[in-house]
Structures are given as C-alpha cells and as structure tokens.
A protein has these predicted regions:
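N-terminal amphipathic/basic leader segments beginning at the initiator methionine
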Residues: 1-28
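Mg2+-dependent prenyl diphosphate-binding active-site environment of isoprenoid biosynthetic enzymes
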Residues: 18, 28-273, 280-293
Length: 297
C-alpha cells in the first residue's frame, strides 16, 4: 500500500518521539543514585537526542491493531534501551572503534571502556525489568514480550549478527552473507519492535506475521540507507563518523551506490506489500517505510 496523502506523519513521529523520550527519562534511576558513574553512563547514550524509530515502531504497531499506546510505551522504552546498549557495545575500540554517536563523543571515550560495557549491561538488564514491571500488560503478554526481545538480542539475533560482522572484517563476502549479518545485527530488533507492539495489543498470529515481514524488510532497508549515508553523508548531519565502514564489505561497496539504492527500494516495496491486509489503517507504518528509504541522517 501507499501512504495516505492526508497523514501528518511529521506530527505523528514527533509526538511518538516525545512520548518515548519522556518515558525513557523516567525509567532510569535519577542522577546521583549509587553508583552515580553507572547511571550517568546509562543515561548518556540512552538520552542522546534521536529519532526513536524503533520505539515508535512499537507504538505504531500496537495502535495499528487497536491497542493502547500506554500499554505499549514500556515496551517501546525497553526496545530503545536494548538499542542504546547495542550502540555502546558496537562503538567500543574492540568493535567499530567509533568516536562519534549522534553528534557526541561515544560513551567509551567519555567514561572509559570498562564503564561503558557495564552501562550497556545495565541497560539490557533494565529493559527486561521494565517489561516485567509493565502493569498494563497481562502476564502472558509480559512473558511473550520478554521471550521475543531476548531472542532478538541473542545468538540467533543481534549478537549473532555482530559476531558474523566481526568475522567478516577485512574479508570479501557475498551478498547472502552481508544480508545475513544485517538481518540479524540490525533487522532483528526492528522485527522485535513490531512484534512487541502487536503483543501489547493482543494481536492475532497472522497480524504478527504480517508485521514481522514488514519489519524484516524495513530493517534491512534501513541498514542499506545507513551504508549509503556512511559513504557520502556529512558527520555534521548524520552524527556519526563518515567512512567508518570502508575497510569492510557494505551494501555500497558490494552493489555500488545505484545497486544499493535499488535494493533498498525493492525492500521498501516488499515492506509496504506486507501491510496490504491492514488497508488504510497501516498509513503510519507505510509512511515510516517511505521515510526510511528517503532518510538523510
């Protein structure tokens, strides 16, 4: 399906971003709580200004299935906490050795590598605690959400993708291997976000599967556009180091700029096709897919 012209997507995304960021500020212990260095580190990366795309995906998926935003908000925060944790770990000297994240120095450059690792672990732990403390969700929904998110993080998800990425560094790999890496390292959390939103709404299995396919294609398209931005983007706009991935295989240096763009377009088309059964109700998710394709940061 195509996004509806009358949708004020900017207003929706901004409202979602504000809702998620406001809730994130409340879920962590206040500054000064012992040990203060830990909580300062957890807050540093988590609360850096961002699009909150994954959190918004939780909210939009829940609302698509007529669920309550308030029920989905803790799950949106949990997904954003996991994402922030993954960024901290990905930026480490032993991983990508990045110096810039969202326009600010990476956490390990501010607090040291050991404290950055502990902050990442703290965020992961806090994400699951937040799900279990979500009073608006039934016990079964909390269990399903915990199981789904832990699977997205683990060896069959984000961690597995990161290991495959590290092993591929400095090697020539084919498109299937590259897609495997990013379907797990990036796509798994997109899928979990959509599914957690559906779980919060009490969605049916067929609805969850449709959202799974939507998010699977969306997540991979997001990574391709990320590679395009890394190749040609301005750090002042993207908030990240430019050219950081030029010593490893990316969609750009494997497929070329035009080939990568065509692949992203095809994935967005597949993502939109997955929404067909929802009709006009899926206008937000359709608009979100178009934003991923056209992103500049």
């Amino acid at each position: 399906m195509k996004p509806i012209a009358g949708l004020d997507l900017d207003a929706y995304l901004e409202a979602g971003r504000r809702a998620v960021e406001g809730a994130l500020s409340d879920v962590l212990p206040p500054l000064g709580s012992p040990p203060p260095s830990l909580h300062e580190g957890m807050r540093y990366t988590l609360l850096l200004p961002g699009k909150r795309l994954r959190g918004i995906l939780v909210l939009a998926s829940c609302e698509l299935l007529k669920g309550r935003r308030d029920d989905a908000l803790p799950l949106a925060c949990a997904v954003e906490m996991v994402h922030a944790s993954s960024l901290i770990l990905d930026d480490l000297p032993s991983m990508d050795n990045a110096t810039l994240r969202r326009g600010k120095p990476t956490l390990h450059a501010v607090v040291g590598e050991a404290n950055a690792i502990l902050a990442a672990i703290g965020l992961l732990n806090g994400a699951f605690a937040l799900i279990q403390e979500s009073a608006g969700l039934k016990a079964r929904a909390r269990v399903l959400a915990t199981t789904r998110l832990s699977s997205a993080i683990g060896a069959a998800g984000l961690i597995g993708g990161q290991v495959a990425d590290l092993e591929a560094t400095g090697k020539k790999i084919d498109l299937d291997t590259l897609e495997y890496i990013h379907a797990h390292k990036t796509g798994a959390l997109f899928i979990a976000a959509a599914e957690l939103g559906a779980i919060a709404a009490g969605g049916r299995a067929r609805d969850i599967e449709a959202l799974n396919q939507y998010a699977k294609n969306l997540g991979l398209a997001f990574q391709i556009t990320d590679d395009l931005l890394d190749y040609s983007g301005n750090p002042a706009t993207t908030g990240k180091d430019a050219g950081l991935d030029r010593n490893r295989t990316t969609f750009v240096n494997l497929c070329g700029i035009d080939g990568a763009r065509r692949l992203a377009d095809d994935l967005i088309a597949a993502s939109l096709a997955s929404l067909a059964s929802f009709g006009r109700r899926a206008e937000v998710l359709a608009g979100l897919a178009d934003r991923v394709r056209d992103r500049d940061r």
